[in-house]
Design a protein with these regions (language model features):
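Sec-dependent, cleavable N-terminal signal peptides
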Residues: 1-40
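Intrinsic-disorder/low-complexity coil detector
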Residues: 7-8, 12, 42, 71, ...
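N-terminal cationic amphipathic segment used for targeting or macromolecule association
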Residues: 19, 24, 35-37, 45, ...
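Residue-level recognition of conserved structural "scaffold" positions that shape functional pockets
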Residues: 23, 34, 47, 113, ...
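Signature of Gram-negative chaperone-usher
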Residues: 38-192
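Negatively charged
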Residues: 191-670
Length: 670
């Protein structure tokens, strides 16, 4: 290594003066480079101290109130060294005292022996402190320099560091000149040259550029020798790589090779989309296997969409992956749909915050062991297991979900899963549960008694198409912040028992399709529902074919604009009590009470008066809007007994109390 020294001279001062010379040395490790190195990297280092000949007037210190003084120093360093630098401090010799060389009695100002605040320094002593420290430390001898600073990366221009020399004097200090010298040594930290691949999206572009209409990549691996001169290559090294990395396609064996002098190749911090094959795109879609054994992933922070869409991969070995620094695994393995098994036991997920869609559409995976997953920092689990239709069991008992805010579509389409134990889930921060269990059509039990839904805003289609579930108890649900409940229970065709007694719907704006096609439920009490903010009730109770009673006694529909198909196909109902309903804003009544068959039982609709159809009339009667409002309701009669033999032809005008000269389908019940 080379050493650079800057020697600084001392000032000669008057009686009882203290002279402190600061010597400074800057040192950098000498790096040797072979002639084949592609991107020559040369480390540089510069440093300075602003006060190289500090002096103190001892008489002034002794005559001061506290008999103490502080001498500020500013150490400035500038280096491009990628591993940073180390700064040390020591005296010039083993002598750490400020000495009076003319004294016949050996007068001196000793170094403090332990860390102390300035005011507590012993008489006639000195020390140093660095940065924000409040204590002064002993002056180190030359043989035992003190490390005052160590960094891990290059500086951003000049980096300034504050130091202070402190001392305390007494009246018995012998007159004279007291001197010593401090040496600051700045050394660049050792730097090992490495090969680093370019950022993921750039790598992806270059990998795809190798393919032609006739030449497709089927294999990916490290080449043992450099490519022939005749081979068409692309560079995939990062700008900070110390080695050139070549990538090429050998049409003979359909293999994409990369070559670099080193055995190990570091992946970029951003390794997102490295092997991403977009939906509908044919580039790199034919890759059958990836040899990743020479990849070092210890510096990677982003692995989002890393292998996404590689639908022909049947095996993927990640056993050598170091993911200890990764924060983003969004869609990492999404749509690698031919995988049947994958071993993730080596993955360290302790820093991951986004794990959304990680296993999206792994439709052929039959086993998945996540017992080692640390999810304590994860905030996003949206779409995590979306479309894993062949998985029959999953154990999430080790999951820490205390920071998760998004669980949208988390288990969407896991249609072969019969049980799901979420008893360990902490959902106290979750805001989005929409589509969470959508189309889990084989699920027969679901216990959510531990769910804290106090922060949830969106429950759209949360249980949509969970068609094998017969009972669902949500009596613990806090829905006070929910704004969207549309299709929440849609197509739960086997549900016979539903407990929503705790539901607070005061902020809900959309209830369209909420209970649509809940075909086996016979009784539904929603008397506690507050619907003041709801604007859409379209298909809310559509095709509840076994429904016999429904209590909507406190429904406020003043802001509703869409009531289309609201009670359509509810063929087991004999009467509807809609006395709380008003319709000043409704624009669409299409199919509201319609049935697709004349085999239905509805005979009476009770209201407190005629309905306002002015908005609907303005909107017009254009299919499907405002048409077939009472289709096939052949048993329905109005207040005075009026009915129509052709209910399909009855229009909006029948949304009124039946009376002489004004026939209608409503019966007055004040």
């Amino acid at each position: 290594m080379d050493y650079i020294f800057s020697h600084l001279s001392s000032f000669k001062l008057s009686l009882r003066s203290i002279i402190l010379a600061v010597l400074f040395s800057a040192v950098f490790y000498e790096l040797s480079f072979s002639s084949q190195v592609f991107a020559l990297y040369t480390p540089t280092l510069s440093a300075s101290v602003d006060n190289t000949a500090a002096s103190v007037n001892g008489n002034q210190v002794i005559n001061s109130t506290n008999k103490t003084t502080e001498i500020p120093l500013n150490l400035t360093v500038n280096t491009n060294n990628r591993t940073g630098y180390t700064a040390t401090l020591s005296a010039e010799t083993e002598n750490t005292a400020l000495t009076n060389n003319n004294s016949t009695t050996g007068a001196k100002i000793d170094s403090v022996s332990t860390n102390l605040p300035l005011g507590n320094l012993p008489n006639n002593s000195w020390g140093y402190k660095f940065g924000s420290s409040t204590n002064y430390a002993p002056i180190p001898a030359l043989s035992t320099p003190a490390q005052i600073l160590q960094t891990s990366g290059k500086t951003n221009g000049n980096e300034s560091n504050q130091l202070s020399i402190g001392m305390k004097l007494s009246d018995n200090l012998e007159s004279g000149r007291y001197t010593n010298k401090l040496i600051f040594s700045i050394l660049t930290n050792n730097y090992d040259r490495i090969a680093v691949i370019t950022e993921g999206p750039d790598f992806n572009t270059k990998l795809k550029s190798l393919e032609t209409t006739t030449n497709k990549i089927e294999h990916f691996k490290k080449g043992t020798v450099a490519p022939a001169v005749s081979m068409s290559t692309v560079n995939i090294d990062d700008e900070y790589s110390d080695y050139e990395i070549k990538l090429w396609l050998d049409p003979a064996d359909k293999t994409a090779y990369y070559y670099v002098e080193t055995e190990k190749v570091y992946l970029n911090a951003d390794s997102s989309e490295m092997f991403f094959s977009k939906y509908g795109e044919q580039k790199i879609k034919n890759i059958l296997d990836l040899d990743l054994s020479n990849f070092d992933t210890s510096q990677v922070t982003n692995m989002s969409s890393m292998f996404r869409g590689m639908s022909n991969l049947t095996t993927l070995n990640l056993s050598n992956f170091d993911t200890s620094q990764v924060t983003n695994m969004d869609s990492m393995l999404a749509s690698v749909s031919n995988l049947t098994t994958i071993d993730l036991s080596s993955l360290d997920t302790s820093k991951v915050t986004d794990i959304s869609a990680m296993f999206y559409d792994l439709s052929n995976l039959i086993t998945l062991n996540l017992s080692n997953f640390d999810t304590s920092r994860v905030t996003n689990m949206q779409d995590m297991f979306y479309g894993m239709r062949n998985l029959t069991t999953i154990d999430l008992s080790s999951f820490d979900t205390s920071k998760v805010t998004r669980m949208r579509a988390m288990f969407y389409g896991m249609r072969n899963l019969t049980t799901l134990n979420l008893s360990s889930f902490d959902t106290s921060k979750v805001t989005d549960m929409s589509l969470m269990f959508y189309n889990m059509s084989s699920l027969t039990t679901l216990n959510l008694s531990n769910f804290d839904t106090s922060q949830v805003i969106n429950m759209y289609s949360m249980f949509d198409s969970v068609s094998n579930l017969t009972t669902l108890d949500l009596s613990n649900f806090d829905t006070s912040k929910v704004t969207n409940m549309s299709s929440m229970f849609n197509n739960m065709t086997n549900l016979t028992s539903l407990n929503v007694s705790s539901f607070n719907t005061e902020n809900v704006e959309n209830m369209s399709g909420m209970f649509s096609q809940v075909q086996k439920l016979e009784h539904l009490n929603l008397s506690h529902f507050r619907t003041d903010k709801v604007t859409n009730m379209g298909s809310m109770f559509y095709q509840m074919i076994k429904l016999k009673t429904i209590d909507l006694s406190h429904f406020n529909t003043a802001n509703v604009t869409d009531m289309s198909s609201m009670f359509s196909m509810d063929d087991n109902l004999t009467e509807l009590d809609l006395r709380s309903f008003t319709t000043p804003k409704v624009e669409n009544f299409g199919y509201m009470f319609a049935s697709f068959t004349t085999d239905n039982r509805l005979t009476r609709i009770y209201t407190s008066g005629d309905w306002d159809i002015s908005r609907a009339v303005s909107a017009g009667v254009v299919a499907p809007k405002n048409v077939l409002v009472f289709a096939n309701r052949v048993n329905l009669v109005g207040n005075n007994g009026w009915s129509s033999s052709t209910p399909n032809n009855v229009g909006l005008e029948a949304l009124r109390i039946d009376r002489s000269g004004a026939p209608g389908y409503f019966t007055l019940r004040p």
